[in-house]
Every structure is written in C-alpha cells, then in structure tokens.
Amino acid sequence: MSLGIVVNVSRQSAIDLARRLARWLDERKVDYVFESLSAEKTGSHRSAPIEELNTQCDAFISLGGDGTLLFTSQHSVTKPVIGVNVGRLGFLAEFSPEEMLPAVERFLNGDYSIHTRSQLEAGLLTNGSPEHFRALNDVVIEKGTYPRIPAFIIKLDGELLSSYRADGIIIATSTGSTAYSMSAGGPIIAPKSSVVVITPICPHMLTVRPIVISDEKSIEVSVDAPDGAFPLNCDGHLRKMLAPQEVVTIKKSSQSINLVANSSRDYCEVLRTKLLWGREA
C-alpha cells in the first residue's frame, strides 16, 4: 500500500499535521509520497509531481480544507481519498485532525467504506481540437470584466432551455450544491442524488430560478455578446477564457471520486453543524 499526500501549504497547521502523519507512517513502515510542493514545505525527501501521484499511489490523503480536497480530486481519478479538514467549513473533508491517525489505520486494515461522488466534464473545441475539464463541485461561466450584462444561452440535449441575462451561470453537482451554488440561492441537494442544478448568478430577471435536472442531460452553454472574453472555471480554477458564441458542453463525467467515509457522522448532522441550523441568532 502506498499513500499520496497533498497538503495545503498555506496553513502551518496542515504542514505540522503532515509531518506528524509522516512520522506515524515511518514508524509503521508504510510507503508514502508527498506532492512536490507539499514535500518541499514539510521537508520530506519523498516527492513526486501531482500529475504522477495517481500512478504511484493506491490512495490519497488530503490535508487542508475542501479546496485542497478538490485539488486532490483532479488527480486522484478513482483512487480513495481520505480528507482531513484543517480548513474552516469542511463539507467534503470528512475527518478532523484528531480523527486522522485512527482513520488512516482503519483504512490500512481494510476497515472503511466509500462515498462515491459523481463529477462533471466540461468539453469544448479549440482550433478543432477537443479540450476536457473535470469538476467535482461545479462548472462556472461568468462575465468576468465584461462591462455589460451578457446573455447566457443554455440548451438541454440540444433544446433551448432559456437565455439568462446574469453575471454568470453555475452548473453544480449534488456535491457542489452546498458551495457556490448555495451562495447564489441554489437548493441544497443530498449528495447521492443523480441530478445537477443550474443556478444563475445575480440574474437581471425577476422570475428566473435555479433549476434541477437529471445528470444524464447534456448541457450546452454559450455567451451571447458582441465581444469580450468570459472565464470558464472548474472547481474555482480558471480553465479557459471563452469567446462569444463559443459552446461549452457539460455532462456527467465517466470518472467518479471515491471519498473515504467517516462512519461517526451523517449528512444531516453535517448540515446542522456547518450551516448552524437550529441555532438562535
């Protein structure tokens, strides 16, 4: 068994936790390798580029917040990911720092279960060549620095859904429904639901609402504007600047993410705890 470790190097607490984990693994003679920057910051000689970890490791450990886990998920493909929350919110990273070592020990002993989360794939043609980007949470197309309100044209399986005059459009998985989409007024969706939600950002339309659709649908998005360049973001990372009328096709990815589950917590508890439900202001 070999473990790939990815650390949020901007947090000293995550770096300290990674060093503690490395000592623990060394004592048990468990093979591991750090992502290159994580190795540099923790002082480890066990290092590999993030792009190579998936071929070298059997599982991943993400030490940080949900952002670190999203970064890890871009490279983990179907390998199990143990998410340790050293961030603030931690919807995806299931384990606290105190739970880390027992969780890793159970995993090494084969005593664990998996939460499989579906992903989105955004595809487009650039100079005749296809490009594809994956997202666990969401794909966002926004107006960026464009000075006016563009129209975002959305089609479902080739049929026109609507033209949205807005600052942008969020296409989120059920996993991503508690992220940017929720902040923009989208619904919270149970993570195993086979749906995606389309949420407009600050629409200049009184009657527009987020819409939940089957994740088997193919979603086409283009921007109707005379000029400008429009950011395409996947899980918060800029992937491309889109030209007006350029079409992005978003659909369910054939690759899913396998998160190691924390058996001591359930989804309803997470919602109550993270969103402060049931507490007086």
Swiss-Prot record:
- What InterPro entries would the database entry show? ATP-NAD_kinase_N (IPR017438), ATP-NAD_kinase_PpnK-typ_C (IPR017437), NAD/diacylglycerol_kinase_sf (IPR016064), NADK (IPR002504)
What the record says about family reads:
Belongs to the NAD kinase family.
Chief place of localization: cytoplasm
Compartment list: Cytoplasm
Q: What is the lineage of its organism?
A: Bacteria, Pseudomonadati, Chlorobiota, Chlorobiia, Chlorobiales
Which cofactor does the UniProt annotation name?
A: a divalent metal cation
Catalytic class of the enzyme? transferase
Catalysed reactions listed for this entry: NAD(+) + ATP = ADP + NADP(+) + H(+)
Keywords, sorted A to Z:
ATP-binding, Cytoplasm, Kinase, NAD, NADP, Nucleotide-binding, Transferase
Originating species: Chlorobium phaeovibrioides (strain DSM 265 / 1930)
Q: What is this protein called?
A: NAD kinase
Question: Kinase among the record's keywords?
Answer: yes
Binding-site list for NAD(+): 66-67, 137-138, 148, 165, 167, 178-183
The Enzyme Commission number assigned here is 2.7.1.23
